[in-house]
Every structure is written in structure tokens, then in C-alpha cells.
């Protein structure tokens, strides 16, 4: 594997964010942050009050996104962020709110 291939390696992570994360603009802010970091995937509310996301992109950018998700937008009160790498073939076209 060449250095460029290593630099461009695309990773995919499934993320759950718990706390006060619905009704505070969390998904909208997540989309903005993902676009700024040039990440792809999606973010959605869950019935239990948490938010889930699938994030895809270079590892360094995903690390930045995970760091941001630990606090989210100003009105959010994040209590827990869990994530795991997913080995999937699908490549997302953009980052969107579901």
C-alpha cells in the first residue's frame, strides 16, 4: 500500500450519542460539522432520545468529529458517546440528516 493510499484510507464508524441531544439542534449542527470536515454518512434521532450516526472519511477527520460529538452544539448536554468501526463496502455520497 502506498503512502497516498494510507492517507486516503476511508473508515466508517457507527456512533451513538446520549444525553440531552434531541430538540437542541444536534442533528443540524452535526451535519454542518461533518460538511466542514468533508465527512460523509448520516445522523438520525432514535426513539430512546439518543442520536445515532454513521460517519465515513479519513481517520483523522473522524477523530475530529468524534471529539466534537463529545460536546455537540451549545444547547446539548452530552453524557455518553459510544462508537465502533464498521467494515462496510458502501460509500456514502454526502452527509445528511435522516
Curated annotation (Swiss-Prot):
The keyword Hydrolase applies. It catalyses: an acyl phosphate + H2O = a carboxylate + phosphate + H(+). Keywords: Hydrolase. Signal peptide: none annotated. Coiled coil: none annotated. The active site is at residues 27, 45. InterPro entries: Acylphosphatase (IPR020456), Acylphosphatase-like_dom (IPR001792), Acylphosphatase-like_dom_sf (IPR036046), Acylphosphatase_CS (IPR017968). It comes from the Bacteria. Its EC number is 3.6.1.7. Pfam families: Acylphosphatase. The keyword Magnesium does not apply. SUPFAM superfamilies: Acylphosphatase/BLUF domain-like. Residues 12-98 form the Acylphosphatase-like domain. One of its GO terms (molecular function) is acylphosphatase activity. PANTHER family: ACYLPHOSPHATASE. Belongs to the acylphosphatase family. NCBIfam families: PRK14424.1 (NF010998). This is Acylphosphatase. It comes from Burkholderia ambifaria (strain ATCC BAA-244 / DSM 16087 / CCUG 44356 / LMG 19182 / AMMD).
Amino acid at each position: 500500500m502506498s503512502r497516498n493510499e494510507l492517507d486516503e484510507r476511508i473508515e466508517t464508524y457507527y456512533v451513538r450519542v446520549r444525553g440531552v441531544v434531541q430538540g437542541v439542534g444536534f442533528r443540524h449542527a452535526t451535519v454542518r460539522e461533518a460538511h466542514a470536515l468533508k465527512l460523509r454518512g448520516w445522523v438520525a434521532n432514535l426513539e430512546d432520545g439518543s442520536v445515532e450516526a454513521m460517519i465515513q472519511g479519513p481517520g483523522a477527520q473522524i477523530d475530529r468529529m468524534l471529539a466534537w460529538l463529545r460536546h455537540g452544539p451549545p444547547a446539548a448536554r452530552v453524557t455518553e458517546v459510544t462508537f465502533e468501526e464498521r467494515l462496510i463496502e458502501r460509500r456514502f455520497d454526502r452527509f445528511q440528516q435522516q
